[in-house]
Every structure is written in C-alpha cells, then in structure tokens.
C-alpha cells in the first residue's frame, strides 16, 4: 500500500502543477480553443489514467457502476462542452480525495500492524560451544534458544534455565511485567526485560502465538459486518440510479420547458454525476470497523472480524461458563473424607487415578498430593466426559467421579452437606469416600456483572457442577438465570433452548475458557474465549479472544463495539443526507462541479474525524 500511496501522490502533484500552469497560461494569454484543450488535457489524462485503472480493476470484479465511472463520465462530458478548467479541477479534487482515503486506510492499518508487529527478526540458537543467530523460521521444537535482556521472545517456549520479567503488553494489553522462571511458558512477541533465559522451543515460528495473532488480525477484513454489506449494496443500486438521474437532467428539461438551453442542462447533469460520487460513504464505514478492531487489539481483545464487532454491540444476553470463567478455576482440596481407607490413601489413589486428566480439578488433586507421580503404577485409564473416569492403580480398580457417575455405577455414596465439588471414589467395587474441592469467584466478575446489569444485559451461567455450588456462585454474583449439572453436549442444547425461548433479534454471547467449551463457543452468536495467550483451542474456537484471564476486558470490548457502530451510523446518515442535499442543489444549478467534489471531500474528512474521535472516546 505504501507504493500505491507514493504513486498516487506523485500523480496528484504532477497534475496539480500542470493544472496551475494551464490556468495561468489560459488567463494571461490569448489561446485558441485547441491550445486550451491541449494544455488542460495533459493534467486531465494523468489523473484519468488512474481512474480508468481503478475502473478496470472493478470491471474485472463485475462492478461497473461506481464513483470512478461517475467522475469519468462527468469530467469527460465537461470537456465535451468546453468546460476544461472545471473538468480538470473536479478530477484533481476527486483524486486528492482518493489519495486522502488511501492514506487514512494505510495509516489505520499501519497503526495496527505496528502494534502487532511483534515478531523478532532473529533468534539466538544454542549450539555446542556457544550460540548463533538464526531466523525464527528456522527454529524447530526441542531446540534450545537464548533470550537476552531487551530481546523479543522469537517462538513459544518453556524456560529451562534462568529467571526474568517479561513485557507482554503487545499480546495482552497488560502493562504489569510478568515474572517467569524455570518451567514457565513464554510466548513469542513478549520482551525479555531483565535476566538471560534459556528455553526449549515448543512450536515452530508459524504456529507460535505472535504469528497466529498477526494472521488473525490481518484476516479480520474478510469477515464483513452487515452494515458494511449494506453500504456496498446501497452503492451498487445507488450509482446506476443517480447516473440515470443525471442523464434525465440533461435530456428532459430542454424537451419539457420552452427556452431551456440544452448546453446548460447538460452541464447541470454532469454536476449531478459529480455530486453523486459516494466516496465519503464508501470509505468511512470500513475504516470505522478497522479502527474498532485495532482499538480492541490494543486493549488485549482480539476480534476476528467486523461482523463479530457489530454483533457484540447488539448482545443482550451473556452466558458464562462457571469453572475458570466466573471462578478462578484454581481448585483447592478443602477436605478429604474417607469411608473405608485412610485419608492419605484416598488422596494418593485419587491423584494417581487423575494423573492423565487435564481437568482443573485433577490438577488440584495432584497438587494436594504434592509428590511426583510414578506412572509405572498406573494401568488402563478410561474417561467419561462430564462424569468421571475409571483407572487401574497398583492393580486396584478405581472409579472416580461425581454423584451422577456413582449413581450410574450403582454405588451408595455419602451425601455432601458442605458447599463445594465432591469427587467420589470407589476402590475395587466398594465406595471409599470423597474429596471436597472448592473454587473462588473472580474479583472482577462481580464488577462485570454489575456493569452488565446497569446496561440491562442479562447474565446467565451454565455449569456441569452441582446445583448447590452453582446457586452459591449465582447468589454472590446476582445472576439472572442458572443452569447446573449439565453435560458438555447439554450445554449446547441449553444455549439453543435459551435463544429460542428468550430471544428474538438480540444477540447472545457465550464466555468460556476456549478449551472445554468449543461446541458452545461455535453455537453462540458471539463466542468469547478467555486466556487466549498460549491456548490454541481459544484461538481456533472463539470469535473474540481475551488474551488475559480478565473479565473486565469484556466491558472495554462492548464499549468499543458500540462506539464503532455509533460512528458508522452517524457517518451513513450524514453521508446520505449530504448526497441528497447536493443532488437537489446540483439539479437546480446552485453547485459548480468543483464545489460538488469539494463537498464530497469534506463529507469524507468529517466522517473520518468522527470515526477517530468516537473510537478514542467510545463512551
């Protein structure tokens, strides 16, 4: 785009100089009509060539009627009726307007790309006897890299030596440095602030976090909002209609009114064509959406397309998963309650049985056990999502899960009076007791729910946990609806039923962790995943990604989406209103060709300023 801006700027500058020479020459010298035509034709052809080039590109896309055709017809017609100066002036101002449009789009994209240009140029690969600089693209998993202070992390990796603090602002929008040590995951695009780190490569450069984020932002243009489609569809019908109107202005008045001069009405018709150019309408809508996506990315919120940005502004209901979304998802063992074995045995067997599970509860059980897991002691393991698992540990048959799982297996299990999640355990066909797990509500969840309530947005929670735990969380956060005890597939069905029974044209947003909620994220109008940093599942499944586990970012995203839509609507109303006014004035001869183009440029610039202002101060 930089080359295109430079080329257009040179064309406009050259044409402007020749236009001034032509005006001065025709004003101070007695020139024949043919000579006047020649000196004005040169700057006109320079700019007309650029217009024809744009028109030809659109023709290849089967788009004939556009602003390029209107200005070409109008200015060529002005030449035909010997209005050379006005024809060149109109074409010059039109091309300057297109140049400003290109510069605005280029700068907006550049600001996003600059912010997202987080891929380093090199990596320090550790080799025998030292290190060597290589392109990040040459790195492979399991190789060891060295990251020095002030260098960017080249690829996703895990720290094997050293400790440091990282600046992750480009990825997460979070200004607080992040401390890392041996065993910490580090993500491409972060900046090492202090110590020297050695890290083992986890992913190739193309699959690392920075590259995937940049690709996602770059492809956001491909998903267009309904308002963008409306603007394009409107101009598709608008342009041929105003072309016909301009022709009728040239033809009908001389036929209908006695004494009407054919030449004067032809000129008015040409002005109508110039006044009808929809440049201000076309540029302001996509630029506002592009700016909105860029503003959100600077807040650590990645939006995959303008259609999702628009949908978010219309969201009237937010559905939240409980574990890891409204709660911290960092479980703690509150109590070990054995029946037929010792507490130590119950915890040890359960930790071993859960050794291969990725569920947060499994991690809390292993953490509570606190010792290394000898996987040689573990035999066959079979998971039942939403219920529990079967495992063989030390030759003993374990069945570990929730109350539903115990019911399925036919065990008489102990009812739990305390609030929390009970993990029941059976050993060799005999109920052995339960372990009570607790979670805590996120600090920012309460603030988010209060804000949503003020905005008259409904808040719903769905969870696979039991009703008592779910009701306790709902009571703390004052949720509107709660659905508990749901299997993963039942969550999708519950969201579908809620949309059918409670909603009409409103949009529903689902907020989850992006790992276990992919089906629900896909089914909702807007799928929002938390903790996208380092989560492949979140980057793939969600429409909007919060790069940090921070629910307050949702407030920022909603404000930006509403500000964007407000700017788009204001721009559309203003642009269409000004077009109607200009067409009326042009029809009655109150506007010259140059003034019509200047008015269109003014509309475009006002809309651009409005878009930037609204996005800077969304609410």
Segments predicted by a language model, with ranges:
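Conserved ATP-binding TGD loop and adjacent catalytic N/P-domain core of P-type ATPases
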Residues: 395, 427-570, 578
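Short, hydrophobic transmembrane alpha-helix segments
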Residues: 22-36
């Amino acid at each position: 785009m930089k080359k295109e801006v430079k080329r257009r700027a040179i064309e406009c500058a050259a044409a402007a100089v020749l236009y001034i020479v032509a005006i001065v020459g025709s004003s101070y010298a007695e020139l024949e009509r043919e000579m006047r035509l020649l000196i004005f034709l040169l700057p006109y052809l320079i700019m007309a060539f650029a217009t024809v080039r744009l028109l030809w590109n659109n023709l290849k896309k089967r788009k004939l009627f556009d602003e390029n055709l209107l200005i070409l017809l109008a200015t060529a017609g002005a030449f035909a009726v010997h209005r050379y100066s006005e024809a060149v002036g109109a074409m010059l101002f039109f091309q300057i307007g297109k140049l400003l449009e290109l510069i605005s789009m280029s700068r907006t994209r550049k600001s996003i790309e600059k912010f997202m240009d987080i891929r380093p140029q090199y990596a320090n690969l550790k080799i025998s006897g030292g290190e060597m600089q290589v392109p990040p693209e040459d790195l492979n998993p399991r190789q060891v890299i060295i990251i020095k202070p002030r260098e960017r992390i080249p690829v996703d990796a895990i720290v094997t030596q050293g400790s440091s603090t990282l600046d992750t602002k480009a990825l997460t929008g979070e200004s607080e440095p992040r401390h890392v040590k041996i065993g910490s995951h580090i993500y491409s695009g972060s900046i090492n602030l202090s110590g020297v780190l050695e890290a083992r490569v986890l992913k190739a450069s193309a699959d690392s976090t920075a590259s995937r984020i940049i690709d996602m932002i770059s492809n956001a243009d491909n998903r267009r909002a309904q308002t963008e489609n409306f603007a394009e569809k409107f101009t598709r019908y608008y342009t041929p209609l105003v072309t016909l109107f301009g022709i009728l202005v040239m033809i009908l008045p001389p036929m209908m009114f006695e004494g009407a001069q054919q030449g004067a009405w032809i000129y008015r018709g040409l002005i109508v064509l110039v006044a009808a150019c929809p440049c201000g309408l076309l540029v302001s809508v996509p630029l506002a959406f592009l700016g909105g996506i860029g503003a959100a990315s600077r807040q650590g919120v990645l939006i995959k397309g303008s259609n999702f940005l628009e949908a978010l502004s219309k969201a009237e209901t937010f559905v939240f998963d409980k574990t890891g979304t409204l709660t911290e998802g960092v479980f703690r063992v509150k109590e070990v309650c054995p029946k037929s074995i010792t507490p130590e045995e119950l915890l040890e067997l359960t930790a071993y049985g859960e050794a291969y599970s990725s569920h947060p509860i499994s991690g809390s059980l292993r953490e509570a056990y606190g010792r290394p897991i000898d996987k040689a002691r573990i035999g066959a393991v079979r998971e039942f999502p939403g219920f529990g698992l079967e495992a063989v540990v030390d030759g003993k048959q374990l069945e570990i899960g929730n109350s539903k799982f115990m019911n399925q297996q036919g065990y008489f299990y102990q009812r739990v009076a305390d609030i929390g999640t009970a993990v029941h355990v059976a050993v060799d066909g005999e109920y052995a007791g339960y372990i009570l797990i607790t979670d805590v509500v996120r600090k920012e969840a309460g603030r988010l729910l209060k804000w949503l309530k003020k905005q008259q947005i409904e808040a719903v929670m769905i969870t696979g946990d039991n009703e008592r735990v779910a009701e306790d969380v709902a009571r703390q956060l004052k949720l509107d609806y709660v659905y508990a005890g749901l299997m993963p597939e039942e969550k999708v069905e519950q969201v579908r039923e809620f949309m059918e029974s409670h909603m009409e044209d409103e949009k529903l947003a689902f907020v989850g962790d992006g790992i276990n909620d992919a089906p629900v994220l896909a089914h909702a109008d807007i799928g929002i995943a938390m903790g996208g940093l380092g989560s492949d599942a979140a980057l793939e499944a969600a429409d909007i990604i919060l790069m940090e586990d921070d629910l307050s970012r949702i407030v920022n995203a909603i404000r930006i989406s509403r500000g964007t839509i407000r700017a788009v609507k204001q721009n559309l109303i203003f642009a269409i209103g000004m077009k109607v006014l200009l067409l009326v004035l042009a029809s009655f001869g109150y506007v010259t060709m140059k003034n019509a183009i200047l008015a269109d440029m003014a509309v475009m610039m006002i809309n651009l300023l409005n878009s930037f202002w609204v996005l800077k101060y969304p609410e």
